[in-house]
């Protein structure tokens, strides 16, 4: 935690800021609290504001959204906690005024810079009305960048989260039964990680007949469709260890081996994963990872989901989305994006997800990794092979 605060205060000094105002929400199973969590260790079930002064001798304050959440927040937070009230921006303004920053410069850290999710409009209006001479600078993207390289302690937490995620993935393959509705699989996934001491984060899945596929990515909402012999279940699963998450993608084949078309798609994904894992090393640029995955395009597939993304508590750079398909088949002479270079100890999800051009068939094969000198180290123990369920 001392390292994190040091990095945050260095950011404030670079921008001549007297404090940061950090906003979080409970979206995505509390993982939209990532920026607040990083400086407090608290994952709130509602909204939060952290007022983080630049001066190390001045106490920060975490304002939680609901009064009855204050006692629990005080048990987990490493900074003092107060209720933000029904006008939390007024509480933030009062704190800034007490710090002598009513006419100063503060940095705003929102939820997610990629999608422009900052503090709510009404809160911002209230803050401006209370402190009309306050200068607010958005530093969300730069702050999120501080979290990209993981500490030794964070990597240890990610290993635990990966093991919890493996437990959930294994439970799907072992417990799925013919006639079971999809939504029961969600209970299996979340129940397995909960029983092992984890928290649910992501449980996306889609079941369909191997010989009549009708979807290329796992669904965010399980249906009441009943599992049948000869089905494939495509998955994306993350379980968390107090904020830090693993992520795994494996297809599960029910009561039958993969058909030739599914086997070919799986083998393409596996080859792409291996090449990408070798390319994801310190100093690697985005174009090198796109080139490593070009086997997907060379075999007539595209992708739908991200090819890789930074991870840990939430998704952050580096991110390579489906626009990379425009560079396949690979041509060394054609310009390709550079993007942020990969750094040692970044946590990155590698997830080749080949889909057919008509987007009726697809699978994901991936894992959370940590960047090391020799390439990406997979944190998961589930084999890179089709999972067979007896059904």
In which residue ranges do the predicted regions lie?
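Active-site neighborhoods and metal-handling regions in enzymes and metal-associated proteins
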Residues: 1-391
